Amino acid sequence: MKRLPNNPGVYRMFNSDGGVLYVGKARNLKKRVSNYARGIGHSNRITRMIRETVTMEFVVTRTETEALLLEANLIKRLRPRFNVLMRDDKSFPYILLTGGHRAPGIFKHRGARSRKGDYFGPFASAGAVGRTINALQRAFLLRTCTDSVFETRTRPCLLYQIKRCSAPCTYEISDEDYAGLVAEAKAFLSGKSQSVKDHLAAAMQAASADLDFEHAAVYRDRLAALSHVQSHQGINPQTVEEADVFAIHQEGGMTCIQVFFFRTGQNWGNRAYFPKADSSLGPAEVLGAFLSQFYDDKPCPKLVLLSETVEEQSLITEALSTRAGHKVQVSVPQRGEKKELVQHALTNAREALGRRLAETSSQARLLQGLAETFGLPRAPRRIEVYDNSHIMGTNAVGGMIVAGPEGFVKNQYRKFNIRSTDITPGDDFGMMREVIERRFSRLVKEHGTPAGEVKNPDAFPAWPDVILIDGGQGQVGAVRQILGEMGISDLVTAIGIAKGVDREAGRERFFMEGKQPFTLPPRDPVLYFIQRLRDEAHRFAIGTHRARRKKEIVRNPLDEIAGIGPTRKRALLHHFGTAKAVSRAAVEDLMQIDGISEAMARAIHDHFRDK
């Protein structure tokens, strides 16, 4: 301890197994560790943490702000047991208006901003983005097809017929007029909604005055679509241009933080978070820790409104400003419209936490009921459900969904593209065998056996207590055999669900090792629970299969050629128009394109001639 510096920095506390218990930051590392060492005046949580700590590691930083940023990054990456943890850290969706194309498209986008274009967001959910894009299609008639589909169209698609697209692909609209629609969409998404609506209203009146009622009806429908967007946005504040609103509510040992997003003066939705935090921590501590992590990989607006004054608020403000590259104001409003926004968020936080507490209580009863029904030693903490999806063996996929004490755990869902070439098309049995082998081989490799998880009871387990599979005694026996070959058959309970007579819900038969098949009473809550798990697995597997099939359908033939990336493909399609025209081109013609060497031109030419 004597060698510790009096500098700001970050410290990590480890238990006897090398697991990270806690990540913290300090203005003075020496004083902070000395405070821990005194062992008096600590809360029960801190006392437990110190008792389990056997070693510590330190990183000295230049400033306390730098320490706060590093701490947030390490907490999100290491997920220590005693820190406040964000449970749902899925990236936010955006609306993307693509650039670098004669006819920009409008798309939902999630993840890194690698594509050229204008991004609008964040939106709170994919559903909010979908509804907005749906309405914007009707209002501005922008395309939503991929570039590869766009380049190969020879006639307008159905969306043109139902007035959801202006068909720039086949020049049903001029590039100049389409650019005008794109500019209007950008203006609307940038907060100039009233000027766009005024322009459309004026155009409608002018068309009506000229007795051009057909065009007047088009403008009327576009205005209605924009009004539909705004009606779904709820509160649209007049004095708040860009802000995120955070409100926290604690009850029953749980915490809910409700976040509302306002951009360009419009409400772009909200999302409820239920961070993992010790029940001894108050709202100011939890909200401060949450805020430090929240913007680690997200853009921060100029204004952040809070329902509580958080610990080290000035330091957090400085850290957010540093990360965002612009000045960020963090405040707790006391009056006016901003106060109303916070109160609205707080009301939503209370309601969301109330629903969560009721759902958690119900889920606990169902898990206990499942344990009693199937003779399990305790209520399962992790259930995995498997299902396959394919059409005559093509684009075959397996899906795994996960459920626990708090419902479905979607960040644990997994997709499996069936790789085996020796599986007969439509062989569900063989597909399930591959999925189970791959899942548990990786589980053993990454986590060892379940014995190591007992030491951290607060963490969501990596190993399932129960796996549910679609099938009867044969499927259960096969799964048990696979697990037995891996030496883990005694660690997991496998349950088969066979559809009832005429595939009627409520008449399912259940199969377990060493037991006779049995059914459950039609109104048994456990039966409904299992049906819900099975239906979720089915939904997930079918969705995965459809996505893979769609990708196969829209795949451009140029994607099959080694060395043809997005840039070369775009250059070829820009010059020749379609992939079919590229396939007919001579080597000399291909060499005229920038970036296409003679060797590449011959590779393209030979690829299509060899087919």
Swiss-Prot record:
Keywords recorded for this protein, A-Z: Cytoplasm, DNA damage, DNA excision, DNA repair, Excision nuclease, SOS response
Cellular component terms per the entry's GO annotation: cytoplasm; excinuclease repair complex
Organism: Brucella abortus (strain 2308)
Disulfide cross-links: none
Similarity comment text for this entry: Belongs to the UvrC family.
Domain of life assignment: Bacteria
Entries under PROSITE patterns matching the protein: GIY_YIG, UVR, UVRC
This protein's record includes keyword DNA repair: yes
SMART domains (alphabetical): GIYc, HhH1
Single annotated GO MF: DNA binding
Protein name in the entry: UvrABC system protein C
